[in-house]
Amino acid sequence: MPYSPGVESASVEGIWQALKVFRGAGIDEGKLRIKSMKGLKRTVRKYGEVVGHRTGVAGTELLPYEQARRRIYLPSYRWVLENRLADLVTELRETSAERDIVLLDYTTNSQVEDLTKPLSHAALLRAHLAGEWPWTV
């Protein structure tokens, strides 16, 4: 987990939600343990305005949304693809070399700087499969 050596999460979304800081609530380490994806989201309706994402569970820096995407979400996502899903990624790469594959998603936003919409998981996976992971800090 970025900025938290030795700390693990059951999901990338768990990291994202756990490190989200609201005007009315700090981080929530319990989100790191959720495997079912139920009760994972933390919303402005319940906690108030998002003020940033903490740099790790013991961090003191708050990152604005785009920087949090670049420094927390994208490295976490890529780590999972390379370390937990490497066999599946290899299989997808091999299949895509033989024929077209279709990746479906609810969103199509592939622009990290477009903060009006969530990032597309399909776009992130496509970029990774193509060896075109362009997102850096």
Per-region residue spans from a language model:
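Charged, low-complexity intrinsically disordered segments
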Residues: 1-137
